[in-house]
């Protein structure tokens, strides 16, 4: 999977609106140095009373998957209804299982460059409940996709600190563990409207102590990976666009390189919307962030 980017989670295309993200962007992503797209799917709202997915929604997804595969990209299908699941853990279960019943059957014959991610950032449930849900969803997938790679992360929003509580079947060697990283939140989420505790802006990042903290945090995950023999995906990381650009770029570069040094694949949050690496209205890369992610794209002059 190597280097990836999160896409289309908040695009109006899913609700019948005019799409910001176009199929042509897959080539742009590939040519921009990325090998993977993590498709952010908020599918529950597109289910009927029997938890069947809307055929039009599925057709839209098919088009995106096929267009990405045509460009040689790996596609992660990420079920991203974590907020709904946190609000009602019991009601989440039948929807999550129905989603994977339908998606695993629909994509059973796709190449192994289509990867399933069972649930983004589980939270609001105990570790035992999430481990049970993950095991049930994995069993559903394995009925039709016995060797497809499946991504599973720990609770508390895919927290590194919760990896030790993640339970994975030892005999299944087609599982990739995932974590997300936004440390320190005071820097990465400064000015974000949904995090009122981080209203202060202008916070810089990049001191030796800052860099050491990133290394120490990722070392915790790497120690778990080595002890458990599981590959890791850094499925999300990013700094909100209210942070100073120079510090955003420095942080992004540091986290991406730290992940690569440890042999992890990664997916930046995100292509469009906020935390962005690509300005769709201007039709151009946000150069400091793009170059931080993909150093080969830096202007040698």
What residues fall within each predicted segment?
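Active-site region of glycoside hydrolase catalytic domains
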Residues: 97-210, 215-240, 261-264
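Well-ordered, non-transmembrane segments within structured domains
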Residues: 30, 34-42, 56-61, 65-66, ...
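Domain-start "cap" segments at the beginnings of catalytic or binding domains
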Residues: 6, 189, 283-285
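Aromatic-rich peripheral "rim/lid" segments of glycoside hydrolase catalytic domains that contact
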Residues: 244-301
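Active-site mouth of glycoside hydrolases
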Residues: 1-149, 154-164, 174, 275, ...
